[in-house]
């Protein structure tokens, strides 16, 4: 499972990387969006957070942390053999995340989870994401979550519902 997220404040980002590592993410990709507030990140610090979390959770590997990439480039290069769970508070398809994801359970499918910046994605970005192949749009509920909370919740749901 991959995590794609918009960079956030250092303390919250460190916490998000720790939780993502504990939840078994294999790759972490910082993604710059229109509303991203933090434009430069220290990937070395993120790597150290991942090492610490891997040790704590008795994980034998450490997720690969990619260089940051802009959303458009990420979507243009998105692998055809991997689905992208797109989490956004504006999605209202009348279904819960469980109802949306459970029918997609297939152990051969590879997954990525996309979490946007605080403030969400721009209208243009929402259109771009919606037009991308293999995107599964989900809502994480009625409440607007902080990015680090949304990362933990979404990864747990995908892992429990799909990745087993």
Language model features with spans:
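Short, solvent-exposed amphipathic alpha-helical segments in soluble enzyme
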Residues: 19-23, 101-104, 128-131, 154-155
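Reductase modules of NAD(P)H-dependent flavoproteins
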Residues: 87, 92-95, 115
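Short, charged, surface-exposed secondary-structure boundary motifs
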Residues: 41, 95-98, 147-151
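RNA substrate-binding interface of SAM-dependent RNA methyltransferases
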Residues: 1-86
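Structured adenosyl-cofactor binding patch, chiefly the S-adenosyl-L-methionine
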Residues: 123-164
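Short, acidic/turn-prone active-site loops that include or flank metal/cofactor-
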Residues: 91-92, 118-119, 142-145
């Amino acid at each position: 499972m991959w995590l794609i997220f918009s960079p956030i404040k250092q303390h919250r980002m460190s916490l998000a990387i720790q939780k993502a590592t504990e939840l078994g993410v294999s790759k972490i990709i910082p993604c710059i969006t229109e509303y991203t507030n933090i434009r430069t990140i220290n990937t070395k610090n993120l790597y150290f957070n991942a090492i610490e979390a891997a040790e704590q959770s008795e994980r034998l590997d450490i997720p690969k942390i990619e260089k940051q990439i802009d959303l458009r480039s990420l979507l243009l290069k998105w692998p055809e053999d991997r689905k992208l769970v797109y989490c956004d508070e504006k999605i209202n398809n009348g279904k819960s995340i469980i109802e949306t994801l459970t029918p997609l359970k297939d152990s051969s499918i590879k997954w990525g989870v996309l979490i946007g910046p605080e403030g969400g994605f721009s209208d243009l970005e929402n259109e771009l994401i919606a037009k991308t192949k293999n995107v599964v749009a989900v809502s994480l509920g009625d409440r607007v979550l902080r990015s680090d909370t949304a990362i933990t919740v979404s990864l747990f749901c995908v892992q429990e519902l799909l990745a087993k």
